[in-house]
Swiss-Prot record:
This is 3-methyl-2-oxobutanoate hydroxymethyltransferase. Keywords: Cytoplasm, Magnesium, Metal-binding, Pantothenate biosynthesis, Transferase. It holds the Pfam family Pantoate_transf. GO terms for cellular component: cytoplasm. It comes from the Bacteria. Pathway: Cofactor biosynthesis; (R)-pantothenate biosynthesis; (R)-pantoate from 3-methyl-2-oxobutanoate: step 1/2.
Amino acid sequence: MKPTTISHLRQWKQEQRKFATITAYDASFSRLFFEQGIRVMLVGDSLGMTVQGHDSTLPVTTSDIVYHTQCVRRGAPLALVLSDMPFMTYATPEQTFSQAAELMRAGANMVKLEGGSWLAPTVKMLTERAVPVCGHLGLTPQSVNIFGGYKIQGRSESDANQLLADALALEEAGAQLLVLECVPVALAKRVTDALSIPVIGIGAGNVTDGQILVMHDAFGITGDNTPKFAKNFLAQSGGDIRAAVGLYAQEVEQGIYPAEEHSFH
């Protein structure tokens, strides 16, 4: 079996073949995910909340992401691994490159950055230096203090138009992938149709090219803070983790998940 690459994701978009992705933080789970058919994994700064117990992603450091990227890579050597760049590690292009290089050396295939068109020069700089970039728009958790909490984004016409413009700017700058979080389904479809690069949704309906879930949400172990867009696949699978992961991948690929009750308008 050959490694999964961004070329595979582009081909899947052209073929309208939906794909599932999930967060991973260690070798055991990344191996299990790959064995159950998930070929794309994100070492997310969500680990600040799910693994470290913080109330936001802001305390996560590059060293944290490096460590978990190394673990995930060992467990799934053929997966396409995305690694988050933590809060305040990409304020300037120069700072971004040194931080991104650490993640790539740790085993990442691509780095993910949160932000709109202001990031375009940074995305261009990284791409020119052979660092693939995944953008992240909509509800960007590192901006929680600006948003005043975890809220749906892009509901007004002006906000929706700005988000679409940001997505196009990131693609033009060289981004090869985009995560779209907590936006209305209609806006998610506009963005997905407008971009030639694959779009991965989370809380964006079933109209995007792929889906991602935080693994703890997919297993129903997030506690009282389970988001509306999440589904407990572990409960639906009788407590069998492997079956739960397989069901998640299957429902995404068949367009069953996310359903209407997991979507925003």
